[in-house]
């Protein structure tokens, strides 16, 4: 009987070994969290307004006068492009070209970014104008007798105007981070995502609604709160009242 029991045990061990070889009974391992649920380290540009265009160009925007000055002083190169509006409180927008030709699609997205994150958002309009210049045309040297406020610049030379640029942005989660910017650059590849337009809700109330909508799609609430809390969502919203666009 002892020999028979050992023989059966050997047969059972052999069967398990064969199953492992065939991939039928792989040893259990701790499942790695999907990349979607991994919070990544913040990038240097995330202290500004920013997004990557659908063509892969990094676009920066100042949050206030101090960050406008920092972008100009540290990150604007002559080979870059800059966008601005004529309205007070305008976003200083920089397209980091890396010496490459910038497609029209990126310019259009940068224009939407520039007007949507400016004070024009709260003006009750559906669209606004902005203009494009080369990095070398932007200066902090005023004309004789003039004075420049902090965050303001002098633009010299020709400007290319973008007329009737529509307002509208999207917020979404992609690669473990909350992102925001033009719909065409943000919504594809982001899950969840929402579109924002000028409306009746203040930033805090809208951020709470966005958070609730995101929480319906993201099962890991701790992860969601770590990258897209209400306060973090507020940082991606334009100035002035807004609402979630019906889609």
PLM region spans:
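Extended, highly charged segments
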Residues: 1-247
């Amino acid at each position: 009987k002892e020999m028979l029991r050992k023989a059966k045990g050997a047969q059972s061990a052999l069967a398990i070994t064969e199953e492992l070889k065939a991939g039928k009974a792989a040893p259990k391992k701790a499942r790695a969290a999907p990349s979607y649920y991994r919070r990544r380290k913040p990038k240097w540009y995330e202290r500004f307004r920013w997004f990557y265009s659908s063509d892969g160009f990094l676009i920066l925007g100042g949050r206030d006068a101090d960050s406008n000055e920092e972008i100009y002083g540290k990150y604007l190169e002559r080979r870059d492009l800059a966008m601005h509006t004529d309205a007070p409180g305008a976003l200083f927008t920089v397209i980091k070209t890396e010496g490459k030709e910038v497609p029209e699609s990126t310019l259009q997205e940068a224009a939407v970014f520039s007007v949507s994150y400016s004070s024009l958002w709260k003006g009750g309009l559906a669209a606004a104008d902005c203009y494009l210049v080369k990095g070398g045309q932007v200066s902090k040297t005023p004309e004789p007798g003039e004075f420049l406020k902090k965050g303001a610049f002098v633009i010299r030379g020709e400007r290319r105007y973008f007329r009737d640029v529509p307002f509208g942005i999207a917020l979404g989660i992609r690669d473990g981070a909350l992102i925001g910017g033009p719909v065409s650059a943000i919504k594809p590849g982001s899950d969840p995502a929402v579109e924002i337009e000028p409306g009746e809700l203040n930033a805090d109330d809208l951020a709470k609604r966005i958070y609730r909508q995101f929480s319906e799609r993201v099962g890991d609430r701790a992860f969601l709160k770590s990258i897209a809390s209400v306060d973090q969502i507020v940082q991606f919203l334009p100035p002035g009242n807004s609402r979630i666009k019906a889609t």
